Amino acid sequence: AAVLVQAAPAAGAQPAKADAVTAMSMKDLSAFVKDEIGFSYNGYFRSGWGASNNGSPKEWAIGSLGRFGNEYTSWFDLQLSQRVYNENGKTAKAVVMLDGNVGQSYASGWFGDNSSNDNLLQFSDIYLTTTGFLPFAPEAELWVGKHQLPKHEVQMLDWKTLPTDNGGGVGIENMALGSGKLDIALLRADIDQYDRTLSHSQQLNTNTVDVRYKAIPLWNNAELMVNGRYAMGNSTDEQKANVNDNGYYKWKDTWMFGTALTQKFNNGGFNEFSFLMANNSLASSFSRYTDSSPNTAFNGRYYGDHTNGTAIRLVSQGETYLTDNVIVANALVYSRGEDIYSYETGAHSDFTSYRAVIRPSYIWDKYNQSGVELAYFNQENKDQLGVKYKESGYKTTLYHAFKVDTSLLTSRPEIRFYGTYIHALNNELDNFSFADEKNDQFAAGVQAEVWW
């Protein structure tokens, strides 16, 4: 690539064409330099302003009612990547990612890790990834460090169907196998194992095997993935004695398996259908109506009598263009479990949950859309005595968005102006209320969301 320098045009000349050539050459030069030094900086954040009709606005049940007009925090991810080797068909790249949250309530934003502080920061990734070093799979990526296999997110509900707890590990991704590709990882994620008073804990070593066979072609624009995960404990003799003699909850190995089918549409939309089944503590995560990502512990705390109960989850998510000017996104979730430990209703609980979020939008042009997000959920838990508890509610959000493309789920940056009404119909699981013990809230605000 070369930089083209243009002399000043003669009187009456049209410089536009030459200017375009100069701009293109600079773009090519920038891409060349970026590739030559092997450095990239990627990120994501969301932030904004919001107010309610009665005091500070409150979020509620984002994992069931959706994010639009229902989040008042500034989450961010910042990733730095530097290629450190690229010779003889082998590459090595160092990657570091920071993520966290900045509160939108107070003017100051000092970071801390106490439960009342909204300002949080962590290193979620720090690893070395390579290609060309595996003689049996030179095309595959081999990575070592704090990392995990790619997450699969239900974007409208802000939780993941496929995350994996990870403190450090080793993994192989994109290894060609038959008609698809294989990902496999071995991950460590220690947890705090609590006693029955929840006042004492011990550090329990756990390790997880995560396997996925993906990109299996089915028919035109459709592919399949199958996945499996098994988390096992590694207790010391002293820790086993604490379980037997001092009232600590017993660790139970936990597994999850499932499949996902992704169909891309010719008009640019897509839909993903997934099925998951899990037992023990991973199944407990299925019963949560807020953050429903399948984790082996509750915010790093392991407790509860897990009795090999199981739960299933069916998810549909995606977007489709009904016409050139109308697009609709969806997130539909059905979950059911039997004899699981619920963090709300205890051991030997059964539950059934329905969630539906629909977001139709009218496309005025490439840069403007107006729409509504409609959401409803209903969950019923039954404890071991047969007592039933219900949690349900609905949300209506009207919005107008400034955009850079027409997709609801894959185009950013975006600025959205919204008004949201949320009504909690039943709250027997969390006893939640908005300000002044009210069961509803109207809020208005503006939010920016961007990734690069």
Residues covered by each model-derived region:
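Transmembrane beta-strands of outer-membrane beta-barrel pores
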Residues: 47-53, 84, 98-104, 146-150, ...
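Short linear functional motifs in flexible/disordered or boundary regions
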Residues: 55, 92, 106-108, 140, ...
